[in-house]
Amino acid sequence: MQDFIGSVRRSLVFKQSGDFDTGAAGVGSGFGGFVEKLGSSIRKSSIGIFSKAHVPALPSISKAELPAKARKDDTPPIRWRKGEMIGCGAFGRVYMGMNVDSGELLAIKEVSIAMNGASRERAQAHVRELEEEVNLLKNLSHPNIVRYLGTAREAGSLNILLEFVPGGSISSLLGKFGSFPESVIRMYTKQLLLGLEYLHKNGIMHRDIKGANILVDNKGCIKLADFGASKKVVELATMTGAKSMKGTPYWMAPEVILQTGHSFSADIWSVGCTIIEMATGKPPWSQQYQEVAALFHIGTTKSHPPIPEHLSAESKDFLLKCLQKEPHLRHSASNLLQHPFVTAEHQEARPFLRSSFMGNPENMAAQRMDVRTSIIPDMRASCNGLKDVCGVSAVRCSTVYPENSLGKESLWKLGNSDDDMCQMDNDDFMFGASVKCSSDLHSPANYKSFNPMCEPDNDWPCKFDESPELTKSQANLHYDQATIKPTNNPIMSYKEDLAFTFPSGQSAAEDDDELTESKIRAFLDEKAMDLKKLQTPLYEGFYNSLNVSSTPSPVGTGNKENVPSNINLPPKSRSPKRMLSRRLSTAIEGACAPSPVTHSKRISNIGGLNGEAIQEAQLPRHNEWKDLLGSQREAVNSSFSERQRRWKEELDEELQRKREIMRQAVNLSPPKDPILNRCRSKSRFASPGR
């Protein structure tokens, strides 16, 4: 009996559970079923004499054989801290967070979880599925998608940790800056297709591409957000009653609305709608239909959304390939990346914004470039348009191409550069050369809603060419151009054949003559009005005193050297006639002369020339202005004397009338009350009209 109990005890303590299935003979074999039942009943009882049976361990698996998601699960959870709310969507709120271990900024998307008993279990199941999907999405990495970092549960909510993008979404940028120019749309579309191609190759549909789900950083790099797990978030939020379709139907493909089954081509439709949103600033169909009406219209119509008319032919063709009604007719993201709208092949043959060259004055006329200008018609180009810069030792501009400009500076600021004007040295002033400017004027339709900072034109022609009016021998300039050409100046003779022309519809010389004449005419009118205002008695007296004081003595009429030195002549700058002529000559020269350097150098060169040539050049102008001033002075003197005579007559009549009134008042007043009579006479004198 004692041996039997000992054998049973040894079987219970030392026998492994795997040995019961071997069918071995002996005591263990005979009592295998009994011992197993006895051991299980003892373990379930409250006695707790025997320990729990040992469960065999699984065979060890090397770390290299683990799948990627299993290896990722070994990473420690992120310790984070929630900050301020930075966004609120249809299915949750987004907060800014920080990784307290590394200091990295995070975006935390908070999704509510149902807490009532009826849907609690279903909500927990959705939460587990969402966590598993986020663990899979953590392995995705691309420059144009937002990285998933993990999940964290809280009471009543699930937090999804995402990469933080500081710039904001495309929809927020549209609200701040308005619709984008086509160059920006092209750059964003290319990055959008690259990120979408990566997702499609990994078998992930986005399902909700729109401007609000495309984030932009401070360097213009876009990142797709809310992909993959968005469907699970919608299902989880639907259970809590937070589901909303506001804003979403405008980007939905027809097959998604009809629920006939959709694939990756539904994302391509949404890409086309997003391009229309960037080009117009508003979603497609939003001007015609509300959300519910848009759902019905998109599901039943056979037409695509309206394409903006201001887009180029390449962009319109790109949109037609995205917005095909039949899903199988839409191009894939990989094919669309080869489209000319994305590759910008149509712009490689010509400069993007402006062209230029480097050259010396000798060979500058042999080079050309075309830059078409769009200017308001009443703003005619003049010499001042070149900012009065007229040296020609080196002309410097730059050529900007799209591939060189992307990512380096904002495309909206390329036009704001000093390279657009020709810079020349002051020491190389040209006698005998002219700068002629005119503009190719366009109709108002050509520059409607044109912003040179945001919508740079691609074809601005500008031609620097040798003027056909000038020859190498000599340049015959008219008097109205106010340019004095010395006959014996060897300093700048090698530059006589150089000129700049900006051709227009009519002749450049005619344009220049008309412009100069109009400026001189306007200036003369203005000065004539100023002269009339200055013709006062004080001015006449001052002018007469100057004439008397400036009369030379008879001794100095024969020889200039015999003029006495003690005569008090007024300074030349104080003489009205000379001051006016100096103003007029300066203004006329400023209308055609390129820079202030012109005046100083012209005077220095005139000093070494023959005096007779200078007198011949200045004599017609002096005679003309002398006659004009004489006629105006006579007219002003006659009008002033006439006006003075009338004033004197009116004053005499008024005084005579007042004396008559006072005489009548004295004769009619009774001598009884002298004080009252005195008051009445004073009141009548104060108001003689009574």
Swiss-Prot record:
EC numbers on record: 2.7.11.25
A molecular function GO annotation: ATP binding
Main location: cytoplasm
GO process terms (BP): cell plate assembly; defense response; signal transduction
Subunit structure: Interacts (via C-terminus) with NACK1 (via C-terminus).
Taxonomy of the source species: Eukaryota, Viridiplantae, Streptophyta, Embryophyta, Tracheophyta
Keywords: ATP-binding, Cell cycle, Cell division, Cytoplasm, Cytoskeleton, Kinase, Nucleotide-binding, Nucleus, Phosphoprotein, Plant defense, Serine/threonine-protein kinase, Transferase
Short motif Nuclear localization signal, span: 645-659
CDD domains found in the cross-reference section: STKc_MAPKKK
Protein role: Functions in the NACK-PQR (NPK1-NQK1/MEK1-NRK1) MAP kinase signaling pathway, which is essential for somatic cell cytokinesis, especially for the cell-plate formation and its expansion, and depends on NACK1 and NACK2 kinesin-related proteins. Functions in the regulation of resistance gene-mediated resistance responses such as the N-mediated resistance to tobamovirus (TMV) and the Rx-mediated hypersensitive response (HR) to potato virus X (PVX).
Stretches with biased composition (Polar residues): 551-568
Family: Belongs to the protein kinase superfamily. STE Ser/Thr protein kinase family. MAP kinase kinase kinase subfamily.
Residue ranges annotated for the Protein kinase domain, each copy included: 80-342
Species annotation: Nicotiana tabacum
Enzyme class, spelled out: transferase
Catalytic activity from the UniProt record: L-seryl-[protein] + ATP = O-phospho-L-seryl-[protein] + ADP + H(+); L-threonyl-[protein] + ATP = O-phospho-L-threonyl-[protein] + ADP + H(+)
Entry's localization field: Cytoplasm; Nucleus; Cytoplasm, Cytoskeleton, Phragmoplast
InterPro entries given in the database record: Kinase-like_dom_sf (IPR011009), MAP_kinase_kinase_kinase (IPR050538), Prot_kinase_dom (IPR000719), Protein_kinase_ATP_BS (IPR017441), Ser/Thr_kinase_AS (IPR008271)
Additional remark text: Plants overexpressing the NPK1 kinase domain produced seeds defective in embryo and endosperm development. Expression of kinase-negative NPK1 causes inhibition of phragmoplast expansion and multinucleate cells. Plants silencing NPK1 exhibit reduced cell size, defective cytokinesis and an overall dwarf phenotype.
Protein name: Mitogen-activated protein kinase kinase kinase NPK1
